[in-house]
Amino acid sequence: MDGRNEKPTTPVSDFRVGSSEQSQAGVNLEDSSDHRTSNSAESKKGNLSGKSISDLGISNNDNKNVRFTADTDALENDLSSRSTETSDNSKGTDGQDEEDRPARHKRKPKVSFTHLRNNGKDGDDETFIKKIINNLTGNQGGLVPGLAPIPSENENGKNDIEKNNRNEEIPLSDLADASKIVDVHEGDDKEKLEALKLEGDVNCTSDGETLGSSSKNSFLAPAVDHFDDYAENNSSDDNEGFIETSTYVPPPSQVKSGVLGSLLKLYQNEDQNSSSIFSDSQAVTTDDEGISSTAGNKDVPVAKRSRLQNLKGKAKKGRMPRLKKRLKTEAKITVHIADILQRHRFILRMCRALMMYGAPTHRLEEYMVMTSRVLEIDGQFCIFQVV
């Protein structure tokens, strides 16, 4: 009986010891004073944790560090696995980029002006910017004249042309155009050829003036007031900045009459000459009739007959100076028209030169107005920029 009672006691003590040891593994260090109580709920947790740890093959001596070491190892394993995955991914992307680089480089189009110009889609889809690019890259020089690309082979030829142009003399007057204008309005008259023979002061011209002097009051007209004529005292706030007292040229009081006014004078002279010739012809006919009548009468004395013949000769001589005067006025009108045309050509040539070498376009009109005032020409100018 005693042996039977002793046998079950040993496992009970062992159980208590095991429970106490297992409970110590599950209890915090601060509660070490109460670790002998084996009937608490913490002992149950210790038993469960002990079973789970024993199942994993971990001894009871390492129970205190099992929970913490397991967590840190898991974190380190996760971080290492992630780093390896990212490194693998980065290597894969780098390899893919290296493989795709030549292909993408080949597929990338070259964006240039020639690509935009020669794409073969010049239709309604063409935008304003594309038109500007086409004009800038064209062979016509774009918006600025004279900037067309010149091949190297033709540069020497261009230099030769420029040298030849420098050596050429610019004629001060050209009567061909003026004579054509006068011929159109004059008619078929053989005596008009003598109009080109310049007489007296017409032949004597200085270096500073063209054929025809500006001192003749017959070819001057009063200046017309235009909207762009600025008074010298009115250059305050309303005028633009480029109009200054040093560059301002006041309009002249008298200007040279234009081509139309000269042609009107030509017609006026023809009317006066025709009327004078008609009156002279009537006078000559009456004188002829009187001479013929007197010649028929034998009773007329010889002195009276000679006087009538002298009157007939004076009438013929009076007709010749009037014809010379008419030819002289026609010559003056021709020279005046040639002078006006020459000044027009000079203004246009100067405007083209300024546009060619980069003068500001918003000031060209003002420059032309000032030049026309200096040349005593009444002119208005409007510049159209070709885009």
UniProtKB/Swiss-Prot annotation:
Disordered as annotated region, ranges: 1-126, 138-169, 275-298
GO molecular function annotation: transmembrane transporter activity
Organism superkingdom: Eukaryota
Record InterPro entries: ThrE-like_N, ThrE/Ser_Exporter
Start-end of Basic and acidic residues biased regions: 32-45, 155-169
Biased segments, Polar residues type: 49-63, 78-93, 275-296
Listed Pfam families: ThrE
Misc. remarks from the entry: Present with 1480 molecules/cell in log phase SD medium.
Family: Belongs to the ThrE exporter (TC 2.A.79) family.
Listed name of the protein: Uncharacterized protein YJL107C
Organism: Saccharomyces cerevisiae (strain ATCC 204508 / S288c)
